[in-house]
Regions:
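N-terminal glycine-rich beta->alpha transition that marks the start or flank
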Residues: 12-13, 21-69, 78
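A glycine-/small-residue-rich N-terminal strand-loop-strand element
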Residues: 49, 53, 69-93, 115
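C-terminal capping/lid region of NAD(P)-dependent oxidoreductase domains
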Residues: 1, 298-316, 323-351
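Short amphipathic alpha-helix with an adjacent loop that forms part of the alpha/beta core around
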Residues: 199-209
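NAD(P)H dinucleotide-binding glycine-rich loop of Rossmann-like/cofactor-binding domains
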Residues: 35, 47, 88-151
Length: 351
């Protein structure tokens, strides 16, 4: 089969090759094999190319791709109910999606929303499930609270803005540049702050009358973390979801005394629906139980059907364009989600 392969650890442009000789993977018990129609790009793909982050290490050669849309064409024992259904899926070990066939555990497979096409559906699962878990299961966002989204024009940021607006929150977005700010405002944010040129603390405090943000979803991390902490309200919740600025550091080296001084909570979240062995727990992985996934997906599908949320598609690309697209992601030259459309043959091909 055809697939986007990492053949060596390096930057995406040097790590990736599109190969036509990759074996079709065998379906496993409790899992499904999806005939993929579309697969999304993620910042995590960049880390996998480089091979520098322990939590996402894989030995080349391997296939990229964390979330997909397609038709289930085979299923292992216990997952037969999915055969023939149009689904979205989170792939096994968050790998293998950018291929003609991909494997996913049944706990990570859901009905594709009927109101979304395949490219939109592939762009839907990871950011909207993560955003919903962050806002409603972990941060407990309330109507009328102020939500600050750091990295608002990203795939996850655009999802969280829409979810915040749908929940009745006042949304403030941080984005890098006026064009990205316009994207955030178009999704319902009350205020877009250009963190490359503006004083973030002053803008947030002026907008909230000195209160600060009740919930902060930080999708970037890194050098701006301490500034963002000063924007959190008393009894607020700071949710570090992404570490795109420095994926290896996160909160490492940050003076956590400032968390105590600020009287706010740091609230973790990671997307995953499974029961993991204690050996996994020893390394810090503690996902949501399997029954939570269908509950979240049903709530999100209802919001799609109501017209309240929709994935922002930045680019529809072919497999041949993945390496260049990931380079652009790495340099913050994108907005929304970039999605591999498997009906596209190559650069510039028509749908």
């Amino acid at each position: 089969m055809r697939a986007v392969r990492v053949v060596r650890h390096a930057r995406p442009a040097e790590a990736i090759e599109v190969r036509d000789d990759v074996p079709i993977p065998d379906v496993e018990p409790g899992g499904v094999r999806i005939a993929v129609t579309a697969a999304s790009l993620n910042f995590g793909d960049i880390a996998r190319c480089r091979g520098g982050v322990a939590s996402v290490m894989a030995s080349p050669p391997f296939t990229l791709g964390m979330d997909v849309c397609g038709i289930v064409e085979a299923a292992g024992a216990g997952a037969e109910e999915w055969i023939g259904r149009r689904v979205v899926g989170i792939t096994n070990q968050s790998l293998g999606g950018m291929a003609e066939y991909a494997l996913a555990p049944a706990t990570g497979v859901f009905e594709a929303p009927a109101a979304l096409d395949d490219v939109e559906s592939a762009a839907f699962t990871l950011p909207f499930h993560t955003g919903y878990l962050a806002l409603h299961r972990r941060a407990r966002l309330q109507v009328g609270e102020t939500l600050l989204v750091v990295g608002g024009a990203s795939a996850l940021g655009t999802a969280i803005i829409q979810l915040g607006v749908a929940a009745g929150a006042r949304v403030v977005a941080l984005a890098g540049g006026p064009e990205k700010g316009e994207v955030c405002l178009g999704l319902g944010a009350e205020l877009a702050i250009d963190y490359t040129t503006e004083d973030v603390f002053d803008r947030v405090m002026t907008h909230t009358g000195g209160h600060g943000a009740d919930v902060v979803c930080d999708l970037i991390g890194g050098e701006r973390t301490e500034t963002i902490w000063t924007c959190v309200a008393h009894d607020g919740r700071y949710v570090p979801i992404g570490f795109n600025d420095d994926p290896q550091s996160g909160l490492t080296g940050k003076p956590l005394r400032k968390v105590s001084m600020g009287n706010f909570s740091v609230v973790g979240v990671v997307l995953g629906y499974s029961t993991v062995p204690l050996d996994y727990r020893r390394f810090g992985l503690n996902p949501f139980p399997p029954h939570v996934g269908p509950e979240v997906h049903a709530a999100l599908t209802a919001l799609v059907d109501a017209g309240s949320i929709r994935p922002v598609i930045g680019r529809r690309i072919s497999m041949a364009e993945v390496a260049a697209a990931l380079e652009d992601h790495d340099q913050r030259r994108t907005t929304g989600r970039s999605v591999v459309d498997l009906t596209l043959a190559g650069p510039g091909a028509a749908r």
